[in-house]
């Protein structure tokens, strides 16, 4: 492993500007290629029940954004693939690693319901069960782009890539509603950005940074450290379109946001590694996506380039938790 004394996270880093070469930030190209497809932004909403549902998945696909449908309504997945393909849209689903999930993979393969993207989605992705699932998907559906995770070490990235994964998802418990670090003592919470850097250096295929994104600038920082795509949870939660339940408190509207390993998602208090919080009700998800695109265009202009590749070359400084100068975000 790399030098474990030089870890850092998003709030510890500032990117250093270069000379601007475009006349307007609107000239900057934020598009990214993943597999055989090009998407409008290097950002994907987290595949969580309070972030994405069928309607949001359809909207994102139609608008040219990448999405990953969650796996918590397993019985609807085959119908979801059918509908997306019928509408001429890409199908991107999540699977687990247990026997019933392997049966599902065999079933959709036999029915020629082949999704363009499958994400193998478990909390600790450096596991034999994940490797077996990658190998099964690649044997039955070689053309499907397989994302595997979640992991937090270069060794894990290499092993999943060697098993056939087309991309790896990096992040163990840094998310806002994830309490893995508290419950288990393990994870990338507090050093997620360093983990992204280390894992991306070891990777020969795309890395998706997952968790710990609190501001739009964190997307640019993730790309600087080697991420191709950035998974975002809390920033995409609590919108008008979001599936979470709306709650009124003291005249203000909030929406529920809970983790994928919380008792609220699992329906039982067993092996809980997530919690539920209320977030202030936000406006339209489309507005947030547009704002994120504009902020990323500004990042590209500060990087002195015309597209996302400029962000991968900028210098940065480590300022250890001081970039807010005492201000709240």
Swiss-Prot record:
Instruction: Report keywords, A-Z.
Output: NADP, Oxidoreductase
Q: Does the keyword rRNA-binding apply?
A: no
**Residues that bind NADP(+), according to the entry?**
207-230
Q: What does the record give as the reaction this protein catalyses?
A: IMP + NH4(+) + NADP(+) = GMP + NADPH + 2 H(+)
Question: Which Pfam families did the record assign?
Answer: IMPDH
| Its EC number(s) | 1.7.1.7
- Name it: GMP reductase
Which residues of this protein are catalytic? 178
Native organism is Lactococcus lactis subsp. cremoris (strain MG1363)
Summary of the function given for this chain in its UniProt record:
Catalyzes the irreversible NADPH-dependent deamination of GMP to IMP. It functions in the conversion of nucleobase, nucleoside and nucleotide derivatives of G to A nucleotides, and in maintaining the intracellular balance of A and G nucleotides.
Q: Name one GO biological process term.
A: 'de novo' pyrimidine nucleobase biosynthetic process
Show the GO MF annotations. Answer: GMP reductase activity; oxidoreductase activity, acting on the CH-CH group of donors
Q: Provide a GO CC annotation, any one.
A: cytosol
**Recorded superkingdom:** Bacteria
Q: Which family does it belong to?
A: Belongs to the IMPDH/GMPR family. GuaC type 2 subfamily.
Among Gene3D superfamilies, the record links this protein to: Aldolase class I
- Please state the gene responsible for encoding this protein: guaC
């Amino acid at each position: 492993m790399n030098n474990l004394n030089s870890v850092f996270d998003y709030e510890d880093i500032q990117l250093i500007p270069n000379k601007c070469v475009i006349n307007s930030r609107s000239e900057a190209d934020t598009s990214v290629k993943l597999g055989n497809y090009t998407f409008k932004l290097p950002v994907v909403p987290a595949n969580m029940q309070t972030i994405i549902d069928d309607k949001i998945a359809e909207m994102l696909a139609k608008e040219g954004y990448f999405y990953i449908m969650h796996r918590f309504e397993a019985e609807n997945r085959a119908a979801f693939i059918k509908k997306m393909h019928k509408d001429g849209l890409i199908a991107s689903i999540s699977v687990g690693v247990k026997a019933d999930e392997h049966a599902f993979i065999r079933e959709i393969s036999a029915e020629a319901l082949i999704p363009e993207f499958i994400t193998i989605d478990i909390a600790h992705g450096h596991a034999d069960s994940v490797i077996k699932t990658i190998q099964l998907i690649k044997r039955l559906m070689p053309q499907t782009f397989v994302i595997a995770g979640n992991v937090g070490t270069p060794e894990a990235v290499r092993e999943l890539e060697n098993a056939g994964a087309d991309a790896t998802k990096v992040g163990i418990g840094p998310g806002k509603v994830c309490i893995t670090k508290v419950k288990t003592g393990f994870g990338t919470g507090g050093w997620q950005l360093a983990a992204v850097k280390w894992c991306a250096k070891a990777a020969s295929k795309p890395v998706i940074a997952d968790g710990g994104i609190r501001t739009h600038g964190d997307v640019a920082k993730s790309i600087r450290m080697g991420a191709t795509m950035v998974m975002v949870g809390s920033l995409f939660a609590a919108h008008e379109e979001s599936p979470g339940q709306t709650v009124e408190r003291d005249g203000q509207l909030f929406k529920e946001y809970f983790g994928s390993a919380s008792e609220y998602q699992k329906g039982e208090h067993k092996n809980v590694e997530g919690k539920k919080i209320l977030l202030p009700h936000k406006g339209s998800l489309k507005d947030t996506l547009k704002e994120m695109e504009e902020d990323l265009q500004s990042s590209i202009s500060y990087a002195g380039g015309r597209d996302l590749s400029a962000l991968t070359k900028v210098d940065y400084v480590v300022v250890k938790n001081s970039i807010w100068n005492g201000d709240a975000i």
